[in-house]
Regions:
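Catalytic cores of the polymerase beta-like nucleotidyltransferase superfamily
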Residues: 1-478
Length: 478
């Protein structure tokens, strides 16, 4: 965190719109402050595009007057139901609201709102680091108002609430998710009383819509080190309420002196590994869900010990229900996550044995355009503390990647389509839709995958005719 003098703050607010806002506020005889995350991010040297202004008076009136003064190119949107307005000008967006005092009923996070002072408005902020305000009026331009020692908390890298955290979280339980999200994004510690209040109020999350919860959860998944957030969600008791499938991965069971690894912490390690490689949100979700089927597939076998057979397939089948319940997209993004969860054991199985062309070709056929992401996930999944074992897998993965590149250079297997279509089979043998069509297509597909025949239509058709004859099928024109 950097130190900012008032003169330096004036320089940081050099965009002409800030001075213009101050002049309009002076003309209208009201105080106006830029507040919240924008001010916080100035101190933390983080990019911030959200500019929020609080007016001790009518935020809508100031926004409308500002729009008139800015003239052509300025666009003002008014949201009277919320008492807010937005001004867009030269690529900059500023939100205006009047200073407010809020109170809540226990069964709702919708506040009862009254006009208030700047102090009232800062009192209702979620965290001290977001309760900062900088005056834009001409005589006090650049002056910081830090009512709750937010700067000190930033220096100490602490998330704390301005008022009693139990009231803060009970009034608006979404703030619990925001608390964990900020701690994750900023890598701050949650202050002790605030952390205890999270645990006491966790059940209150039930009144929050799933859409609001998943918005915060996605921000945790997208953070530089997402595991921070999931460890905290587990600690405070929110995780089993919002993501029970992930919570069930926690813990280690021992039998006859043999234990399995804690699949929750393994999953978080895989997620962090993926996060170091990519910002792809849905690849991160695939990492988060890659072992989600393990609790349902867990078995004890006297010789083998703990097993999780077919956990990848079981997990891929769980993805749809998880996405539907959590209000995640039920489109190609979900199918992408399903595919990676289902296939994530394939490269590991190949790397644990001899890396053959046919095995790599089959993998490439199944993964298609997502093969690189699948390999990234699988490499992240190697979290063994046995460095020799880990290095052996990584060396074999490198060989798999080399063979993938070689196969791709020879033939575009990523977008592979079976040279033999069902329509061609029906026309050749005069068939109506039947199971024999699928059998022949699969036989041709397997033959190409196993390098029995070349990946050409001519070879595939000849092979199809041969197999059809063995099945007792004859061409229609014979």
């Amino acid at each position: 965190m950097r130190q900012i003098t008032r003169d330096q703050m004036v320089e940081l607010l050099s965009h002409p719109i800030f001075r213009q806002i101050g002049r309009v506020a002076d003309e209208m005889g009201v105080e106006c402050y830029v507040v919240g995350g924008f001010v916080r991010d100035l101190y933390l040297e983080r990019p911030s595009k959200d500019i929020d202004c609080v007016v001790v008076g009518s935020g809508i009136a100031v926004a409308q007057a500002l729009g008139k003064q800015l003239g052509r190119g300025a666009h003002v949107s008014v949201f009277r139901n919320f008492g807010t307005a937005q001004v867009k000008w030269r690529g900059t967006e500023v939100e205006f609201v009047g200073a407010r005092r809020e109170s809540y009923q226990r069964d709702s996070r919708k506040p009862i709102v009254e006009d208030g002072t700047l102090e009232d408005d800062l009192d209702r902020r979620d965290f001290t680091i977001n309760a900062l305000a900088v005056c834009l009026n001409e005589g006090r331009f650049g002056e910081l108002v830090d009512r709750f020692q937010g700067l000190l908390d930033m220096e100490d890298r602490i998330i704390a609430t301005p008022l009693d955290p139990d009231i803060t979280f009970s009034d608006d339980p979404l703030r619990m998710m925001r608390c964990v999200r900020f701690a994750t994004q900023l890598r701050f510690q949650i202050e002790e009383e605030t952390a205890e209040a999270l645990t006491r109020n966790a059940e209150r999350i039930s009144i929050i819509s799933q859409e609001r919860i998943i918005d915060e959860l996605n921000k945790i998944v997208a953070a530089p080190q997402p595991s921070i957030g999931f460890v905290e969600l587990s600690r405070c008791g929110l995780l089993p309420l919002i993501f029970p499938e992930l919570s069930k991965l926690e813990g280690v069971e021992t039998r006859n002196g043999r234990a399995h690894k804690d699949n929750f912490y393994h999953t978080l390690e895989v997620l962090d590994n993926v996060a170091q490689q990519t910002d792809n949100l849905w690849l991160r979700w695939a990492a988060l869900l890659h072992d989600i089927g393990k609790p349902r597939s867990k078995r004890w076998e006297p010789v083998a010990g703990w097993t999780f057979h077919n956990h990848n397939y079981i997990g891929s089948r769980m993805v749809t229900d998880i996405f539907r319940r959590m209000k995640l997209p039920l489109d190609e993004r979900m199918k992408y996550v399903q595919k990676l969860v289902d296939l994530h054991m394939r490269p590991i199985a190949i790397a644990d044995a001899e890396v053959t062309d046919s095995a790599v070709r089959r993998l490439l056929f199944e993964a298609g355009e997502d093969i690189d992401d699948l390999m990234t996930l699988c490499e992240a999944d190697i979290t063994s503390k046995n460095q020799m074992k880990k290095q052996r897998f990584l060396d074999n993965f490198r060989l798999v990647r080399e063979k993938l590149a070689d196969l791709q250079a020879r033939d575009n297997y990523r977008t592979w389509q079976n040279p033999i279509t069902g329509e061609e089979i029906m026309q050749t043998f005069g068939l109506q839709p039947c199971k024999e069509i699928g059998i022949l297509k699969q036989l041709v597909k397997d033959a190409i995958w196993e390098s029995v025949i070349p990946n050409t239509h001519e070879a595939a058709r000849e092979y199809m005719l041969q197999k059809a004859e063995e099945m007792g099928l004859k061409p229609a024109n014979d």
